[in-house]
Amino acid sequence: MAMAMDRIVFSPSSYVYRPCQARGSRSSRVSMASTIRSATTEVTNGRKLYIPPREVHVQVKHSMPPQKLEIFKSLEGWADETLLTYLKPVEKSWQPTDFLPEPESEGFYDQVKELRERCKELPDDYFVVLVGDMITEEALPTYQTMLNTLDGVRDETGASPTPWAIWTRAWTAEENRHGDLLNKYLYLSGRVDMRQIEKTIQYLIGSGMDPKTENNPYLGFIYTSFQERATFISHGNTARLAKDRGDLKLAQICGTIAADERRHETAYTKIVEKLFEIDPDGTILGLADMMKKKISMPAHLMYDGQDDNLFEHFSTVAQRLGVYTAKDYADILEFLVERWNVETLTDLSSEGHRAQDFVCGLPARIRKIEERAQGRAKEAAKNIPFSWIFGRNIRA
């Protein structure tokens, strides 16, 4: 559906993007996606059964000018020599069984008993955050699908030999271990309702994600740079909390996953660094565009069949525990601005200079807004039941 628009207004829901002005350079190819679900209305239409609990929004497609496809073709040699070095050979990689009780061992039951004893020291709110992180990792099919929507770098055949396609498949293979490991650990812990968790994973993969990357690899790689650092921080903090509570094995697990995320973050930031080198104006415009729309978390369409605001509630608990906070969001942006030398960019268009000023000033603005929001959040705190922990209430 093609349509002209000066401004798109979205729902005021906490995790729906704020209004942003459509630029003239954008493709006119957009599609409307209705994402409304009522928890109390039984829906018989098969398609509607899988629509996530979000408001109507507009999806922009293929916003990158076709002439810029050549940039990514020309970078294949660089990707082969630089990007792929951030992958680890399978034979040198850790596997989930390295951290779990050994089922073939005579001591298996004792090992499981020890694991469950350690987990007794961990509070319910910690498990809510750990489960949310695990569910996010388990939706990996969606993330590989997202990368393969990006023009110029997608895997065109499913087994393409281009370095971009090799990276996507191998990155996915490395990430696949994260959800596997956390899932098995949580299953053995006996502290969580695995059926509700499994339902949430199925709902989430079926719902997909809406990162607003528009098939545009500039936007896509900016998004992944931000997200990999966010997951590095989140897993690092769950490791710290597990250590504080005496579960050193779980701390090791979360720390190992965090190390993978840090390596992947470095790879994606290298791509964007290269884009800034080749096309500073186009890249700064892409960065400003993504920040105006706000970076959504990859599991923002999370649903368990009961709570239409599940992701918001999970995020609130993560914020309260200090696992992933609005301060982290601002810190990540500030880190990337410094990493990519955004403040010192030259040879920009007037629009590029405005984008540069916006991005460089944004971390301070986010922090000011967050300070005010924290006061309101404390006043509005309430108990929220989480199906993942058998319906027990958590302060959020």
Curated annotation (Swiss-Prot):
The protein's annotated catalytic reaction(s) are: octadecanoyl-[ACP] + 2 reduced [2Fe-2S]-[ferredoxin] + O2 + 2 H(+) = (9Z)-octadecenoyl-[ACP] + 2 oxidized [2Fe-2S]-[ferredoxin] + 2 H2O
Q: Which cofactors?
A: Fe(2+)
Question: Which residues constitute the signal peptide according to the record?
Answer: none
A GO CC annotation given for this chain:
chloroplast
Tissues where this protein is expressed:
Ubiquitously expressed with a preference in leaves, flowers and stems.
Transit peptide as recorded in UniProt: 1-29
Keywords of the record: Chloroplast, Fatty acid biosynthesis, Fatty acid metabolism, Iron, Lipid biosynthesis, Lipid metabolism, Metal-binding, Oxidoreductase, Plastid, Transit peptide
Q: Where does Fe cation 2 bind?
A: E175, E228, E261, H264
Organism superkingdom: Eukaryota
Q: Which GO terms describe its biological process?
A: fatty acid biosynthetic process; fatty acid metabolic process
**Compartment list:** Plastid, Chloroplast stroma
Kindly summarize what the UniProt induction comment says about this protein's expression. Positively regulated by LEC1.
Q: Does the keyword Oxidoreductase apply?
A: yes
**InterPro entries from the entry?**
Fatty_acid_desaturase-2 (IPR005067), Ferritin-like_SF (IPR009078), RNR-like (IPR012348)
Function summary: Converts stearoyl-ACP to oleoyl-ACP by introduction of a cis double bond between carbons 9 and 10 of the acyl chain.
Q: Write out the similarity annotation.
A: Belongs to the fatty acid desaturase type 2 family.
Subunit and interaction comment: Homodimer.
What PANTHER family is this protein classified in? Answer: ACYL- ACYL-CARRIER-PROTEIN DESATURASE-RELATED, STEAROYL-[ACYL-CARRIER-PROTEIN] 9-DESATURASE 5, CHLOROPLASTIC
Q: What is the protein name stated in its UniProt record?
A: Stearoyl-[acyl-carrier-protein] 9-desaturase 5, chloroplastic
